[in-house]
């Protein structure tokens, strides 16, 4: 059962929204790592999920750079 955000949801976002989601995910990962270091983290699996979401966002951005994916709302 997948808990993270599927890649198709990221593909529906435009560039600004992707960058925003990426920054939010990076901030969450930082906070989770801080909680892990202080022993306050209750859900260790969330670390893996956030890392994978970050990787999915980078993948979608790279697909668009290579022209493998179309930006939603862009005219062909």
Curated annotation (Swiss-Prot):
One of its GO terms (molecular function) is structural constituent of ribosome. NCBIfam families: L29. It comes from the Bacteria. Belongs to the universal ribosomal protein uL29 family. One of its GO terms (biological process) is translation. Gene3D superfamilies: 1.10.287.310. InterPro entries: Ribosomal_protein_uL29 (IPR050063), Ribosomal_uL29 (IPR001854), Ribosomal_uL29_CS (IPR018254), Ribosomal_uL29_sf (IPR036049). Disulfide bonds: none annotated. It comes from Corynebacterium glutamicum (strain ATCC 13032 / DSM 20300 / JCM 1318 / BCRC 11384 / CCUG 27702 / LMG 3730 / NBRC 12168 / NCIMB 10025 / NRRL B-2784 / 534). GO terms for cellular component: cytosolic large ribosomal subunit. PROSITE patterns: RIBOSOMAL_L29. Keywords: Ribonucleoprotein, Ribosomal protein. This is Large ribosomal subunit protein uL29. SUPFAM superfamilies: Ribosomal protein L29 (L29p).
């Amino acid at each position: 059962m997948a808990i993270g955000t599927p890649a198709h949801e990221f593909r529906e976002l435009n560039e600004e929204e992707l960058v925003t989601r990426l920054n939010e995910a990076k901030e969450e990962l930082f906070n989770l790592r801080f909680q892990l270091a202080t022993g306050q983290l209750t859900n260790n699996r969330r670390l893996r999920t956030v890392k994978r979401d970050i990787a999915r966002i980078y993948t979608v951005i790279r697909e668009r750079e290579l022209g493998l994916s179309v930006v939603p709302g862009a005219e062909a």
